A protein has these predicted regions:
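Repeated scaffold domains used in trafficking and secretory/extracellular systems
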Residues: 296-305, 335-350, 376-391, 396, ...
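Surface-exposed loop/turn elements that mediate protein-protein interactions on large endomembrane-trafficking
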Residues: 320-335, 359-378, 399-422, 442-468, ...
Length: 599
């Protein structure tokens, strides 16, 4: 090249040179050193050239340019190199080219970030784009999400009439939610609504319980009218009856609020009995929930975590981070892109992460002060899903670190170097941190006591002993003695393969759990004390299996058409979110579905 200017086409393939892997890695290292030297000299555009043209690290180059205020160049590169459209929209907003960002959002159906930004700056323009977003969702057949999007525009709710009717006609939990909204929007059609409502009340099928819960939760989000209050009285009594039969009922707080809204004085005297009814009916009962393809929201949710008082923080990729009330109303927005959230033990702070090529962009969130700020770009392979507010543990290649989460830069205050294998996963409590390593010899667990950071044990895992012809697919450990190992084996007298989970208590195999034959992939198992959740994907759905202790299956969640599911434990709840805009909060201690929202 005659100069170090970025070309705005796809990365050229270049000449075909047959280099040994070690030479190629050496060349890549030289380029990386050149980038670091140019950055230290303040030659930002030349450094970004090395990233984009030589290392072909397009996402990292865009993030680097944006961090140094080269917003237009970052946007042009993001668009030219075909980065995710949400990132392109974000970069054009940062560059001040709002209408170009909007056009890309419309063209590629990635509205959320554009709508949020416009509504903050110009309510009228934001409302117009929100309407376009709703229309786009309706055209795709996602009618319930279209209603949710346009519902924030009170003057345009009439546009939702046809979408509401189509959702009600289709049936399911989404139908029940839309029936509640129809009662608010068209009270003059009360007789027609009441007839449909009676079907929900008198339906004795097991799945009808969730339909009644969906209607109730939709009501809790609204300012109700007399017609809706009339329906609430029989609904609350039916929900109380449901609680006698199953743990799949409303949370007590939700039920109490429903009774207050219904103004049912007689029922209020019966409320003290409700908490006992909400407990699991038996230790072996398995909670099961199926969410239909049509029952989804408008947002792509990458991660979610429960906060105090029923609030929920959701990571929306390039669209930033939202904090929702227990009823799904947005009460805070942080303009920091995020695919994962690492939450502090007190749930008042979080670290957000999003991949940018070989690096990860980190930001710090303060939920109490409602502020967020970019922290740094860092390299890490694995990390603990929580931190104590001060120290965050991460793994990079064969090193394990404790990072000062409050430092200006990404600073390690403690390190275990060269652990004899790649750091595979990590987990912590306030008393210990464990990490799992993988080498040619197999898996090994390292256990350090906190806060002393004293090594208490180091053990090889015997997961593959007596595994015959099976292959280890993915695994994780817990802070206790339990571990979950997903294995793959060939079906006898067949060319097909199947997956199963081995659940261990230390080295003792407690249970083998076979997955359906159409299962094709998994998330890494998520663990907490004696609980573990495994997310398994088929072509049609994602299924979340929740286990307790030595393999007792206590809950199953079927998320139809979900392609990316996130799970997160805290002391009381399992939070599940997916790329269809669904959020579930499950109380695994009492076996109750606390929240079931769509965003």
């Amino acid at each position: 090249r005659n100069n170090l200017q970025i070309s705005f086409g796809q990365n050229p393939s270049g000449s075909s040179i047959n280099l040994e892997a070690e030479w190629f890695e050496h060349l890549r290292l030289l380029y990386r050193q050149s980038f670091e030297r140019l950055e230290s000299q303040g030659r930002i555009e030349e450094a970004s050239f090395v990233l984009a043209e030589l290392l072909q690290a397009n996402a990292e180059a865009v993030n680097f340019l944006s961090k140094h205020g080269k917003f237009r160049l970052a946007a042009e590169l993001a668009e030219a190199r075909n980065l995710p459209k949400e990132n392109v929209v974000r970069q054009w907003f940062l560059a001040g080219e709002k209408m170009r960002a909007v056009r890309i959002a419309i063209l590629h159906n990635c509205f959320e970030y554009a709508v949020t930004k416009l509504e903050q700056e110009n309510a009228e323009t934001g409302a117009e784009l929100r309407e376009v977003w709703a229309e786009s969702l309706a055209e795709s057949g996602n009618y319930s999400a279209a209603v949710d999007v346009i519902w924030k525009l009170e003057k345009r709710r009439d546009r939702a009439k046809d979408w509401i009717e189509k959702t009600i006609e289709f049936g399911g939990a989404a139908s029940a939610r839309m029936l509640a909204r129809k009662t608010i929007l068209y009270p003059e059609k009360f007789n027609e609504i009441k007839e449909k409502f009676q079907e929900i009340i008198h339906d004795d099928r097991f799945e009808a319980i969730e339909n009644r819960n969906a209607f109730a939760r939709a009501v809790l989000k609204q300012t109700i009218n007399d017609e809706l209050r009339t329906l609430l009285r029989p609904l609350t009594r039916k929900i109380l009856s449901d609680a006698l039969k199953t743990s799949q009922s409303l949370a007590l707080k939700e039920f109490r609020e429903l009774v207050v809204m219904a103004k049912d004085g007689a029922l209020r005297t019966d409320l003290p009995a409700f908490p006992q009814l909400a407990l699991p009916s038996g230790a072996t009962e398995c909670f099961e929930l199926v969410i239909a393809e049509s029952d989804k929201g408008a947002s792509v949710i990458y991660d979610a975590c429960s906060l105090p008082d029923g609030k929920i923080a959701v990571a929306l990729g390039e669209a930033g981070i939202k904090v929702l009330s227990r009823y799904g109303k947005t009460i805070a927005f942080f303009d920091q892109p995020a695919q994962k959230l690492v939450v502090s033990d007190f749930s008042n702070k979080a670290i957000s992460l999003i991949k940018r090529g070989e690096t990860v962009r980190l930001a710090r969130i303060d939920f109490v002060e409602r502020r967020a700020a970019f922290w740094c770009d860092a390299k890490l392979n694995v990390y603990t899903p929580n931190f104590d507010g001060n120290l965050w543990f991460i793994g990079l290649k064969d090193d394990f670190y404790a990072i000062d989460a409050n430092a200006k830069n990404f600073e390690a205050v403690w390190r275990v170097p060269e652990v004899g294998g790649e750091v595979y996963s990590a987990i912590r409590t306030n008393k210990q941190v464990k990490f799992l390593t993988l080498s040619a010899k197999g898996f090994e667990t390292w256990w350090y006591e906190l806060p002393t950071l004293i090594l208490r044990s180091r053990n090889e895992r015997k997961w593959l002993d007596n595994a015959a012809e099976s292959f280890l697919h993915i695994a994780n450990i817990s802070e206790g003695g339990h571990s979950v190992v997903i294995m793959q084996e060939q079906i006898q007298e067949s060319t097909d393969w199947r997956f199963y989970a081995n659940i261990f208590d230390y080295e003792h195999l407690c249970r083998r759990f076979d997955f359906p034959l159409d299962t094709v992939r998994f998330n890494r198992p998520d663990t907490f004390t004696q609980y573990a959740v495994v997310v398994a994907y088929s072509e049609q759905q994602a299924t979340d299996y929740l286990f307790f202790g030595s393999g007792n299956q206590i809950a199953t969640f079927h998320l139809v058409k979900a392609r990316n599911v996130s799970t997160k434990f805290n002391e009381n709840y399992l939070t599940i979110s997916d790329d269809c805009g669904r959020i579930l909060i499950y109380d695994f201690q009492n076996r109750i579905l606390q929240q079931n929202l769509r965003l």
